[in-house]
Design a protein with these regions (language model features):
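Enzyme catalytic cores with a strong preference for nitrogen-chemistry domains
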Residues: 1-214
């Protein structure tokens, strides 16, 4: 990586289903971070997390796509790029995604590969599994973009390292539970960084939804 990137991490609460409100909050945060290269937002920040069966409604899927395009258009001003968590409908498949927004467009999309299906999570019922993701080229750097569970398990991280990623950016919707911080330290920070020898940025959300606290 030859270029020094300045990255801002936006830990925002969100309201499930409030697409415009969530998008407006991201744009307001971006306006305060005008001197950075990239602003990061948590997993599914645009739609709210977990949105559960709301994401299965075609009208909601289309509205989410429109708001993502609106966010992308805002980056035409030459300010910071944004990494935004949302959903993507392709054919009959629905994906949990992160989108890199830069230069007024959606510059890249990566789909979540590891879908959790335990405890409060039933993503295999809702989402299709994305392919193992390739790194994203951004301003002279190769970024690996594991989405939440992608970063907890080794497959995606080691694949990204083998594909030449220089920095891992993991956006999360990881709820609180007893000893969770210690688990993150061991399972994500120490173990996965040691496996790949790559620097890691880990961003989680704040707030709560239903019975979950982040």
């Amino acid at each position: 990586m030859t270029h020094i990137l300045t990255i801002a991490m936006a830990q925002l609460n969100q309201l499930v289903g409030d697409l415009k409100g969530n998008a407006d909050a991201m744009l307001q945060w971006r306006a305060k971070a005008e001197a950075v290269d990239l602003v990061l937002f948590p997993e599914q920040q645009l739609i709210g997390y977990p949105a559960e069966d709301l994401v299965l409604k075609p009208a909601f899927q289309k509205a989410a796509a429109r708001e993502l395009e609106r966010l992308a258009a805002a980056t035409a001003d030459g300010g910071p790029a944004m990494l935004v968590g949302s959903i993507l409908k392709e054919g009959d498949a629905l994906y949990n995604i992160v989108a890199l927004l830069e230069g007024g467009r959606i510059a890249a999309i990566r789909k979540k590969h590891e879908l959790p299906n335990y405890g409060t999570f039933d993503e295999k019922r809702i989402f299709a599994q994305g392919p193992l993701p390739a790194p994203v080229e951004f301003r002279g750097a190769k970024l690996g973009l594991p989405i939440c569970e992608d970063g907890w398990l080794p497959r995606v991280r080691t694949h990204l390292a083998a594909q030449g990623a220089e920095l891992l950016i993991s956006v999360n919707g990881s709820p609180y539970e007893i000893d969770k911080d210690d688990r993150r330290l061991e399972e994500v920070f120490a173990t996965r960084v040691a496996e790949t020898s790559l620097p890691l940025i880990f961003l989680n959300r704040v707030g709560g939804q239903d019975e979950l606290v982040f």
